[in-house]
Design a protein with these regions (language model features):
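N-terminal maturation segment of proteins
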Residues: 23-611
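N-terminal export signals
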Residues: 2-3, 8-25
Length: 611
């Protein structure tokens, strides 16, 4: 998965566009395309100014971003979100005034993509809580500046010059300010009866306290400088020591107190927190979930339709797993019970030690090299960006998902990376690892996003700025299936079992997400449902279920997207017969960037019709 922050949810769904330069002023438009491009350029300037972190993540220059951003962090206040929403509303009104019929076919795709993104962004942010309908609680075990700020500063802030080192120190102060802004929102939302579930608050408190229990010197915020400053050529040893001392002071005097204020705020609302898992309990909860589902899936499927899709797919995948397990001589018990038994087998377990974790990373890298060699069989266009596989930082692993992807910088200065949560190697039996690799790396998120960013044929908004979970996560699941179709499991029957278990897991997500947020299931009911469907360990299932509680609808995007891609592929194959070219199908899909599923279907129908 690709892990969002509160601010990126608004920026990604409602966010920016760029067709030429990020100028603050544009020439008067002379036709429909020019009018549209002017609107998009204006909006990107607004959006990038509101997200210095996005500018850094994309590797933009100050000239392209339109301002100096390297020493700034975004405004996390509710007022800033309201101002951004007003800007977006104005941009959408202007875009709707453009004559779509006067645009070229390519520009009509951009018009449809951006319009859908902005409409969804306004719909989800209209509830004026947390990060919107898809992330209703500002601080949980997965949301809040404390979850992504340290990782951003450690992994994405550049440290190549003295100026960038000074900017890092400035960002420490900005980070403390973000924490306080989100602490204020905890109280504001609580006054509106929007409080995270008790277990989400408890997990957040564990992680916040883990940070404050360290000395400033031992936090990742200071250790980043200790580790990286020696490579800055124009710094003397005295300069390095001075910068590290200043960072320690900033953490001690600004960041740590901000953490403590956030801890105090969560403790203050904790007695009012309930154990109910779904957003149905919140004011306008049903409307909120409907908006989240529309945004996440880019469809009009109802919660009941999505729930029933999941039930049917679980039955299909379980039948295939049963066949493999019987071939392994495992015939007693349910499919889930037999998968659990296999997960505990000594030959499937890595040592729960640092050496065991290093072996997991080594095995994943070997699998990546093997699948990369097969990519010319399925694609004409190959991704160029490098991929690194990393461990989820220990300071966030308690509440982090099993894996997530971080895209490469546009300028190539930072490779793509996916993170695997290695808090307990027992959660990763050997047979489960390959399909994770294919989902997050090649031919999954890394492959799809790298080709999207490297494409010169689509506007910047569609190659780097906008995101659609149903497309990107649907592609991730389709990539798992594609790896199977390419024969990676020909001599690895248990690896294919892992793929089918993963597919079952994603189908189960449809059931439990709609179960909790629409059918009012409890957290415990959802945990039992997923364990019975997948055979996964209770610890890993619990982390997943608690994730769906705070990101309503997001888990549905995966399988809804996969099923849509398969349906579109089947339709194209049926229409074209012997003329169907899988490589061309994939190239066309990815070259057009992440798009809503409705737009994807039209793009691929037009492609097939034109052949």
């Amino acid at each position: 998965m690709m892990l969002p922050s509160r601010r990126s949810l608004l920026a990604g769904a409602a966010g920016a566009a760029l067709t030429s330069a990020c100028a603050s002023t544009v020439e008067p438009p002379t036709d429909a395309a020019a009018r549209m491009n002017a609107i998009l350029d204006r909006r990107v300037a607004e959006s990038l100014r509101r997200s210095p972190e996005r500018c850094t993540s994309l590797g933009l220059t100050e000239e392209r971003a339109g301002y100096r951003f390297i020493d700034k962090m975004s405004d996390a206040s509710k007022q800033a979100a309201r101002e951004s929403r007003a800007e977006l509303r104005a941009a959408l009104a202007d875009l709707r005034a453009v004559d779509r019929d006067a645009l070229s076919a390519r520009d009509r795709v951009t018009y449809d993509v951006v319009t859908t993104a902005w409409e969804n962004g306004l719909a989800t942010s209209a509830f004026d809580i947390g990060g919107g309908a898809g992330s209703p609680y500002v601080v949980t075990q997965l949301t809040g500046a404390y979850t992504n700020g340290p990782d951003f500063l450690d992994a994405q802030h550049p440290l190549r010059t003295r100026d960038e080192a000074d900017a890092y120190l400035a960002r420490l102060g900005e980070y403390a300010r973000q924490l306080d802004q989100e602490t204020a929102i905890i109280g504001e939302d609580a006054a509106a009866s929007v409080i995270a579930p008790d277990f989400a608050i408890d997990r957040a408190l564990v992680q916040l306290n883990a940070f404050t229990s360290r000395s400033p010197r031992d936090t990742v915020l200071v250790q980043t400088l200790v580790r990286r400053l020696p490579s800055v050529a124009d710094l003397s040893e005295a300069d390095r020591n001075s910068l590290i001392a200043r960072a320690e002071s900033a953490v001690r005097d600004a960041v740590m107190p901000a953490y403590q204020r956030q801890i105090d705020a969560l403790r203050a609302v904790r007695p009012r927190a309930v154990h109910d898992a779904g957003v149905w309990r919140l004011p306008r909860g049903a409307d909120m979930y409907a908006a989240a589902l529309r945004s996440r899936t880019t469809t009009t499927l109802s919660p009941d339709e999505i729930h029933n899709m999941g039930v049917a797919l679980i039955a299909e995948f379980n039948a295939e797993m049963d066949t493999i397990l019987r071939a392994e001589g495992m015939t007693r018990g349910t499919v889930a019970q037999r998968v659990q038994e296999l997960s505990r087998r000594a030959d499937q377990l890595y040592p729960n030690t640092d050496a065991g974790r290093e072996q997991i990373l080594a095995d994943l890298n070997a699998q990546t090299r093997a699948i990369e060699a097969l990519m010319p069989q399925a694609f004409n266009t190959l991704a160029r960006a490098r991929l690194e596989i990393r461990r989820v930082p220990p300071y966030t692993e308690a509440g982090a998902p099993g894996g997530y992807y971080q895209r490469a910088a546009l300028d190539g200065s930072r490779p793509g990376a996916y993170y695997i949560n290695l808090r307990d190697t027992g959660e990763w039996p050997r047979f489960t690892l390959p399909t994770l690799n294919y989902h997050e790396g090649v031919p999954g998120h890394h492959w799809q996003i790298s080709i999207q960013q490297e494409s010169g044929a689509i506007p910047f908004i569609r190659s780097a700025m906008l995101g659609f979970s149903a497309f990107s996560e649907g592609w991730g699941l389709y990539a798992e299936q594609l790896a199977d179709e390419l024969g990676v499991y020909a001599n690895n029957r248990l690896g294919r079992l892992g793929y089918l278990q993963s597919a079952t897991f994603r189908a189960s997500r449809l059931v439990v997400d709609t179960g909790m947020h629409h059918k009012r299931w409890s957290r415990e009911q959802a945990i039992q449902s997923m364990m019975q469907a997948t055979g996964d360990l209770e610890s890993s299932v619990t982390t997943e279920i608690e994730r769906y509680c705070v990101w309503p609808g997001q888990a549905c995007s995966y399988m809804v997207g996969r099923q849509a891609i398969n349906r579109i592929r089947d339709n194209a194959r049926q229409r074209l017969g012997a003329r169907f070219d899988l490589k061309a199908f994939h190239d066309t899909m990815l070259a057009n960037g992440a798009v809503p599923l409705t737009v994807l279907e039209q793009i691929m129908t037009d492609w097939a019709t034109a052949l």
